[in-house]
Each structure stands twice: as C-alpha cells, then as structure tokens.
Amino acid sequence: MTYWTSEDNVAGKPGTALFIILPTIGCYRYRIGQACYMCSYPTAAPKVKWTQEAIVNYVKEALEKIEGTEGPFAVRMFTSGSFLDNGELKPETRRKIFEILAEMDNVEEIVIESRSELVRYEAVKELAEIVPDKHFEVAIGLETANDDVADVSINKGNTFADFVKAAEITHKAGAKVKTYLLLKPIFLSERDGVEDAKESIIKAEPYTDTFSINITDIQKGTLYERLWEKKEYRPPWLWSAVEVLIWAKRKFPNKRILSDPVGAGSKRGPHNCLTDYDRVIGKAIKKFSATQDLSYIENLKPECRDRWEYIVENGLLDWQLVTW
C-alpha cells in the first residue's frame, strides 16, 4: 500500500493533498463477483488481512509526511472500497483515525469514499462531530445519473435515487458531498460521453458540494481493457474533459469542480493525438483543479482539436475511428 502528496484544492483554495490508500480487504462488490466494469482497484487489496490496529498505525505513518509542515492540507483516504463499510473498517477504527486528524491544525479538509448504500446517518454523524471545524466530505461514486448507463456500462449496482438518499443523509449528518462522475463509460460515443457527464452534473448539482470528474483510464483485468484491446473503446479525448470542466465551472461557479487526469497523454489514459502537448493539457487540468482558475484550460493551443470536433459533431463510435 502507499501514500503520496500532490498539489490540490483544499477547502476551496490551493494547497496540498495527502492521499492514503488504506490496506483493507477492498470493495464488497468485487468480493461477491460484481465489480464495476472499469475498476481494478480491489485487486490491489492485501492478500493477507491487516488488523484494524495495523491500519491505524499505517495512517499514523502516512501522516508523518505532513506532520509539522505548513498547510493547508487535505487528507483523502481511499480503501479500494468504502470507508464506511464495517467489513473493511470497524467503527472504532474510523473514530481513531478521525481523532488523530482532529488534532492536526494543518489539515483543513478530510475526504473519505463510500458507495451509496453504505452511507449511514450515525456513521457519518459521529465522524463529523469529531472534526467539526474541518471541511469533511463523503465522496460517493455516482459515475452517471443515467440508471441505464450505470447498469449496462458500469455495473454500478445502485441507482441515482440511491445516490440522492446517501447525499441527503450525509448533509443531515453534518458532512459535505463530493460526487464522482465517470467521463465516457463504455458503449457511449465521445459525444454521448460528454453529454452524459453534463446531464449528470445538472441532475446531481442540488445534492453536491464538490464534483470530481474522473476521466476514464484503462485498468488491467477489466472489461474496459478487453474492449480497448479489441479497439472497440478509446479513452476520452482530453478535449472532452476540458469541454466538461469549462462548461461545469461556468454553469455552477460556486461549486468546486475537480479532476485528476490519470495517465493523461498515454494510450491507456485520456489523450488527444498522443503528442507531448497532451501532457501539457493534463498538467493544465490539474492546475485548474487546484486553483479553480479557468484561465489554465481556456487558453490552450487547439492542437488536434479539429479531429475531436469532427468526431463529436458526427457522433462517431470508437470502433468507427481509423486513428486513436
């Protein structure tokens, strides 16, 4: 397991995020053979189960990376599953972790992840009460507000109504909601992927404090990888991500719009024409995400943009493309 720091947006201003991958047993959907089609994260879960005490000690070790350092810092904890799943983290383990974070003045934001159906009022409330002066978000993987896309293209296992219920519980319990959306699930054209993201943002906006646009990358051992290998799926164009981010920030200027383009400029990640400029765009997206300053992505050189525009305007499917 691992942890690292990266430039990021912290409670609405530029700062640094400490990302911690907690060594739990991973997502229960994966354990019952119903993993999301794009996700291989649970395969990285430890083969030997860690004790709850060892997990707490691991968090302490990770926090040493920012201890005594001037912030602001966000601590974002991932489990390759759900932080609120009692099968991964016991309630007392969650409390111990939050009690440690409560004592760190340089940590202004805390983010945990959970599937919708695992969000429970008491579980969120007790954590929110431990860190009343910090920006505490529960990140929920909505992926799309279209239930058909969620079922056929993602195998999500829950619905938009489930998300709404979880978001309302989270707010009532005293925490904020971060909504994960997946840009361009399989079986959608580039145009439909962009439109699905925009429509999902509109539907989820009343329940959301922060949007995180997850730009699809190809993870090993997934259905997405199999379709990609057969040239029936192409990761999103970076221009699609830029389009969605600019549109979202202009439409909802008071919402925090985040995105981390994993693998930008590589064949497995979001890319345009696989030139060096793809990585420039990827870095610009990260700067926008950290600062919320649209100028980083509004003034990009339109390299390869004409190809993207042709594909989007004509609604071409990935298997119809000659070049990737």
From Swiss-Prot:
Provide the disulphide bond pattern.
Answer: none
- Note accompanying the cofactor annotation: Binds 1 [4Fe-4S] cluster. The cluster is coordinated with 3 cysteines and an exchangeable S-adenosyl-L-methionine.
Metal-binding is among the record's keywords: yes
Instruction: One Pfam family, please name it.
Output: Radical_SAM
Which pathway does the database say it acts in?
Answer: tRNA modification; archaeosine-tRNA biosynthesis
Which top-level enzyme class is recorded in the Swiss-Prot or TrEMBL entry? lyase
Q: Which cofactor does it need?
A: [4Fe-4S] cluster
Query: Which sites bind [4Fe-4S] cluster?
Result: 27, 36, 39
Q: What is the consequence of disrupting this locus?
A: Archaeosine is no more detected among the modified nucleosides in tRNA fractions, but a nucleoside corresponding to q0kN can be observed.
Query: What is this enzyme's EC?
Result: 4.3.2.-
Could you state a single Gene Ontology molecular function term? lyase activity
Query: Which GO terms fall under biological process for this protein?
Result: tRNA wobble base 5-methoxycarbonylmethyl-2-thiouridinylation
Annotated keywords: 4Fe-4S, Iron, Iron-sulfur, Lyase, Metal-binding, S-adenosyl-L-methionine, tRNA processing
Which InterPro entries does the UniProt record give?
ELP3, Elp3/MiaA/NifB-like_rSAM, RaSEA, rSAM
Purpose of the protein: Radical SAM enzyme involved in the synthesis of archaeosine, a modified nucleoside present in the dihydrouridine loop (D-loop) of archaeal tRNAs. Catalyzes the cleavage of the C(epsilon)-N bond of the lysine moiety of q0kN15-tRNA, leading to the formation of archaeosine at position 15 in tRNAs.
Q: How does it assemble?
A: Forms a robust complex with the archaeosine synthase alpha subunit ArcS, likely an alpha(2)beta(2) heterotetrameric structure.
Q: Which family does it belong to?
A: Belongs to the radical SAM superfamily. RaSEA family.
| Name listed for the protein in its UniProt record | Archaeosine synthase subunit beta
Q: Which organism is it from?
A: Thermococcus kodakarensis (strain ATCC BAA-918 / JCM 12380 / KOD1) (Pyrococcus kodakaraensis (strain KOD1))
